[in-house]
Amino acid sequence: MARVVAKSLGEVTSIITKGVAPKYVEEANENTVIVLNQKCNRDFSISLEFARLNDCREKSVPQERMLREFDVLINSTGTGTAGRVAQLFAVTEPMTIDGHMILLRPTDEIDPLYYGYAVKSHYAEIEKLAEGSTGQTEINRKRLETEIRITFPEDIQCQKKIGRLLYQIDQKIRNNKEINNNLVV
């Protein structure tokens, strides 16, 4: 049986940063990247339906803020939206996040897929980290790093098995929702 450890989110996170303040354009071209915003993060998943485009000639995006497969995204502002968590399972085009989202990437100590599920399991706690006046709440990143505890098996192969199992269950749920939506039509 694998030994299980618990560490603060900050200890198992290599990058925790907010997104960029984009310069939006309407038409895609070779100088644009997709920008995810809070509307894109719902029900623990990312939808590109409300994504916009940033003109990189006007506002460059640091390489570390370009999104990768298995990145975890948290909405950082707003009553009712701050604290929403989702994980990217595929990044097929260059994309980043705006300044109202937080990007998390794990250290090498933890499997990225497992990490996403571990962070999502703390959604209710993360949501409570929002501070500020009504309508202007924001997730406190220092508290996010120190107060959220991630529990994981030390054996990375065990982490990978758990992450894959949870992903397969989520895939079945997505497939069932799609079937149900087709039945309604």
Give the positions of each predicted feature:
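Non-catalytic DNA-recognition/assembly elements of restriction-modification systems
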Residues: 1-20, 151-185
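Sequence-specific dsDNA recognition surfaces
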Residues: 6-26, 39-71
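Structural signal for hydrophobic
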Residues: 9, 36, 147-148
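A short beta-sheet element
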Residues: 37, 54, 62-122
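Short helix/loop capping segments that flank catalytic or ligand/cofactor-binding pockets
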Residues: 44-46, 84, 112-113, 127
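A short glycine-rich beta-alpha junction/loop motif
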Residues: 94-102, 133-163, 167
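Short, positively charged
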Residues: 111-143
